[in-house]
Every structure is written in C-alpha cells, then in structure tokens.
C-alpha cells in the first residue's frame, strides 16, 4: 500500500465458489476517494466525486471531457487520480462509449496523453502492455474491471443495460482469452458502483432483453412494481461473468442514485453531471 493511502472496508458481495471472502475497499489519499477490489492486485479503482478541482455540476473529481468542464480541470483531476492510484496519466487509453458490445485491444501506441485524440467508439478495452492504463466512464451504468494475474492482462468495460444485454462483460473476457491466452478461471473481476435495483426503474423492454440474453435465471434479478420493473444489473453482469467461467467476482453494494452526493447519477441529476471512472493499469508480471 502506498504511503498516505488510508484503507477502510465497506460492504460488498463476492460470488466466488471455493474462494475466500474478499471485499471492496474505500481508499483515500488526501481528499481523493476511490474504491478498490482486494482480488485485483494491479493499480485500479472506481472513482467517487471527491478529490478533484472541478466546480458546479462537475464538482469535484469529474473525469469526462465534453460535459461543460474545462480541459485544464479534467487533466488536473486525472493527474491527481494517477498519483493516488499509481499510474501515468499520459499512458491512459479512454473510451468513446456508445452502449455497444465493442471491445478494443489496445497497446501503448493508443496512448496519446489524456484525451487529445478521437478514440474509436467502443464500450470496453483490453491490454497486456505494461504501463497502459484503461479508463471507462459511468454515471449510473455498471463499470467492470478484469485482471488476470498470470498473464498480466487487464480489461475495463462500461455496461449500460444495452451493453449488459449484449454481453459486454463476457465479450471482454473472451477478448482477453483470445488475444492474451488468459484462462477464464484465473481472471478476477470487480463490479463497481451503479444505479442499484432500488432505483433502476424501466419499462418491460429492458427485463425482456435480459431474459432473452440470459434465460429465465435473469428473472431472479427483476422486480415488478405495478407497470414498472426494477433490475439488478450488478447481479445480471455477475451471472454473465460466472457463465463465462470467471470464478472470482467482487461486487460493490454502492448505489449511485442513493449516494448521488458521493457518485454522479445521470437519473438523480437529470443529466446535469460529471462522470466518474473505472481505471485499471497493466503491470509486468514477475516470473
């Protein structure tokens, strides 16, 4: 653990047959706060709103360009995050998210220093290039981080309900297996804060898409209240990852809507918001 970083355990769920309990941890460096998973041993984190320099509706650790914040503020926020988590912000690769099932394989040739380039559209990134750091953005959608400690490969995915129905998490695992020779059973996954079932209200098309994708078992994670439906997208993504052969899955219990003072929530803010991120850095494996 880095000097100056304070750890505090928070509630989490772990879906890991034949594995010891691990938990999501809150870490702080100064005022900057982020969450990490015990099972992922490379620098990574799910950010909160705390610890940056942005103001107004982007207060304070906004990581997204193009939402009304200044480029200087976002760059400083990324520098602060890099210093806290332990990665070089000049070696970030980011996403231009479109609620798809597109996974990009990236190397250090895709790094361009913050966001000074147009990244291709995708909703997940994978790499096995040491030093490269992956970043996806959320503000209610479900962030997924993946790490194979044997090959060193990492992945990050943004799973909205459409991406969840399309299997973005599974396709990220498959990209790691295909491109880097990962074994599914070696991969550790962490599912970060999202809008929880208590507030994720939908019409019938959303649960129908989940049942079509994952069968009747998905109905366990759907609650009907009158004419509306409430879904647990963390549990559905965990179901998908388990079926893909991932055994070690840690799940944050944080709800972005319930804790909209701590996380950005698109629904709670009616779109007036910044974005938090899920970040993971590839490190060289010691042989």
Regions inferred by a protein language model and the residue ranges of each:
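Short, basic, low-complexity termini and linkers enriched in Ser/Thr/Gly/Pro
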Residues: 1-19, 287
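Active-site microenvironment for binding and transforming phosphate-containing groups
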Residues: 18-287
């Amino acid at each position: 653990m880095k000097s100056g970083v304070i750890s505090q355990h928070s509630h989490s769920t772990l879906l890991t047959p034949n594995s010891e309990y691990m938990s999501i941890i809150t870490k702080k460096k100064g005022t900057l706060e982020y969450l990490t998973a015990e099972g992922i041993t490379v620098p990574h984190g799910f950010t909160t709103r705390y610890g940056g320099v942005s103001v107004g509706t982007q207060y304070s650790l906004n990581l997204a360009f193009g939402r009304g914040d200044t480029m200087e503020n976002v760059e400083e926020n990324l520098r602060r995050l890099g210093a806290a988590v332990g990665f070089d912000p000049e070696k970030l690769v980011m996403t231009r998210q479109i609620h798809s099932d597109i996974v990009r394989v990236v190397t250090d040739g895709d790094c361009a220093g913050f966001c000074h380039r147009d990244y291709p559209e995708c909703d997940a990134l994978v790499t096995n290039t040491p030093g490269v750091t992956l970043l996806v953005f959320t503000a209610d959608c479900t962030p997924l981080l993946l790490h194979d400690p044997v090959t060193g490969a990492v992945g990050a995915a943004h799973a909205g309900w459409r991406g969840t129905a399309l299997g973005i998490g599974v396709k990220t695992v498959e990209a790691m297996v295909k491109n880097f020779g990962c074994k599914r059973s070696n991969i550790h996954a962490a599912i970060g804060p999202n809008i929880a079932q208590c507030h994720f209200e939908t019409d019938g098309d959303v649960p129908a898409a989940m049942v079509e994708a994952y069968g009747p078992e998905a109905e366990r994670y759907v609650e009907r209240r009158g004419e509306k439906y409430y879904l647990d997208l963390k549990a559905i993504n965990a179901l998908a990852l388990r079926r893909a052969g991932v055994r070690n899955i840690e799940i944050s219990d944080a709800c972005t809507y319930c804790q909209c003072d701590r996380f950005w929530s698109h629904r709670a803010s009616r779109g007036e918001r910044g974005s938090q991120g899920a970040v993971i850095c590839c490190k060289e494996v010691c042989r």
